[in-house]
């Protein structure tokens, strides 16, 4: 614990809080164009081929975004909407692509949690 004299000499440093989604620039979502769509493997205990896309946003930044759900129709030059939200087992992936908006189709045959995957109500 510092003495009063030490505090007078050098004041306490403010803790700077880092944003978890800096590319969104305080917006809830952002639009972008896919520059590359590919699969990648997760960190140590897990094993899979996770679908991700490199997206160039309207503000000029380029980020890696996760494509949620089973199956997708994305390819290079697809226009997508991204939101915040990281994928814990993919380092560097801090954004999710919103399904069912712009060029991204909703997940087919999805019955539960449909609103998160842009799926219409089954008949």
Swiss-Prot record:
GO molecular function: rRNA binding; structural constituent of ribosome; tRNA binding
Keywords linked to the UniProt accession: Methylation, Ribonucleoprotein, Ribosomal protein, RNA-binding, rRNA-binding, tRNA-binding
Pfam family, one: Ribosom_S12_S23
Region Disordered, annotated ranges: 103-123
Biased composition (Basic residues): 113-123
InterPro entries attached to this UniProt entry: NA-bd_OB-fold, Ribosomal_uS12, Ribosomal_uS12_bac
Positions where 3-methylthioaspartic acid occurs in the chain: 89
Transferase as UniProt keyword: no
A GO cellular component entry from the record: small ribosomal subunit
Gene3D superfamilies: Nucleic acid-binding proteins
Protein origin, superkingdom: Bacteria
BP GO terms, sorted: translation
HAMAP family per the UniProt record, alphabetical: Ribosomal_uS12_B
NCBIfam families to which the protein is assigned, alphabetical: rpsL_bact
Function of the protein: With S4 and S5 plays an important role in translational accuracy.
Family designation: Belongs to the universal ribosomal protein uS12 family.
Oligomer status and interactors: Part of the 30S ribosomal subunit. Contacts proteins S8 and S17. May interact with IF1 in the 30S initiation complex.
Name of protein: Small ribosomal subunit protein uS12
Species, as recorded: Nitratidesulfovibrio vulgaris (strain ATCC 29579 / DSM 644 / CCUG 34227 / NCIMB 8303 / VKM B-1760 / Hildenborough) (Desulfovibrio vulgaris)
